Amino acid sequence: MKFVDEATIEVIAGKGGNGVASFRREKFIPKGGPDGGDGGRGGSIYAVADRNINTLIDFRYARLHRAKNGENGRGSDQYGAAAPDITLRVPVGTVVHDADTGEVLFDLDRHDQKVTLAAGGAGGMGNIHFKSSTNRAPRQWTPGKEGEQRRLRMELKVLADVGLLGLPNAGKSTLISRISNARPKIADYPFTTLHPNLGVVRTSPSRSFVVADIPGLIEGASEGAGLGHLFLRHLARTRVLLHLVDISSPDPEADPIEQAVVDANAIVEELRRYDPELAAKPRWLVLNKLDMVPDAQDAQQRFCAEFGWTGPVFAISGLNGEGTQDLIWALQDYLDAEKRKDQDAQDQADGTYVFEDPRFDASRGGAAPATPPGGDE
């Protein structure tokens, strides 16, 4: 299925049905009074996040979504039927913008999350509501309200814990196929990857994380060159970025480290130009194609010194898997720690956080703390 991560649609909710002016007509009851019913509610349009969908392709070709109008009220105090609602199923991670103002309306980041894109109009009132002590036979009724109408731009940002960043042919697809269940197309020419790929990395039956691989960036990507800038938004939700750098060179006369430093600086600069917030995310350096370097340790030290890198660095070979296990476990431990921090912060905000007793010593096997001097015995 074709990957589509952006679509513009128009949603038109249904109009509410009109109320009606009607009077009770029954034998031997000459003055039956008003019995006009209310109009039915117009159909609303909802969006529901579905984890079984991974593309917005359905909305690329079906741009107009119009709900039906509610039925008009009837005599004998009969209300008009409400119109059926329309539910649009979208991928988890879809962000809905107002197409005219650019305002972010909804961010559907949980499975089964439901939001109202356009609310149906309320039904009008029948003349039964206007009866009073001074107006026993009212002829007033109200029309139904118009439903909401919007032009919306839907943008998909995939949900991943780790994002892969690098030039074309840096080995991103090879790495994700090595450490996860993803099977992207791999070839020895640039721009083999044409759309984001997601892979689940399992470190144990109960521990896993998701990796996102996007098309490679090239110099000038922030100004529209290449394909990578089209998909950088998919890295916005990640917790850490893996900056893959190819430290090998097909040219035996060229210095691969010097070229790798130039390439790495180009990626960092394009990231800063595109989105400073994305550039500020935690970033780990991954030196790839270790199997093609004579002295891997010397290459790593030289690169870090010339690149001015002091953060986490891993030297791997995506082809034979060397060094990938250390990378996987380091990522899992980091992500688990970040999730614990988020959970503690949420618990503190909710008032449910349990602070540790400073008198408790885990090394004593959970024994109760001694009674302080002067305490009750």
UniProtKB/Swiss-Prot annotation:
Cofactor(s) needed: Mg(2+)
Region (Disordered): 127-148, 339-377
Range of residues in the leader sequence: none
Compartments it resides in: Cytoplasm
GO CC annotation: cytoplasm
Annotated Obg domain residues: 1-159
Keyword list, A-Z: Cytoplasm, GTP-binding, Hydrolase, Magnesium, Metal-binding, Nucleotide-binding
Record-listed Mg(2+) binding positions: 173, 193
InterPro entries: G_OBG, GTP-bd, GTP-bd_Obg/CgtA, GTP1-OBG_CS, GTP1_OBG_dom, GTP1_OBG_dom_sf, OBG_GTPase, P-loop_NTPase
Binding site for GTP: 166-173, 191-195, 213-216, 288-291, 317-319
GO biological-process terms attached to the record: ribosome biogenesis
Described purpose of this protein according to its UniProt entry: An essential GTPase which binds GTP, GDP and possibly (p)ppGpp with moderate affinity, with high nucleotide exchange rates and a fairly low GTP hydrolysis rate. Plays a role in control of the cell cycle, stress response, ribosome biogenesis and in those bacteria that undergo differentiation, in morphogenesis control.
Subunit and partners: Monomer.
Family, similarity comment: Belongs to the TRAFAC class OBG-HflX-like GTPase superfamily. OBG GTPase family.
Name listed for the protein in its UniProt record: GTPase Obg
Source organism of this protein record: Bordetella pertussis (strain Tohama I / ATCC BAA-589 / NCTC 13251)
Lineage of origin: Bacteria, Pseudomonadati, Pseudomonadota, Betaproteobacteria, Burkholderiales
Gene from which the chain derives: obg
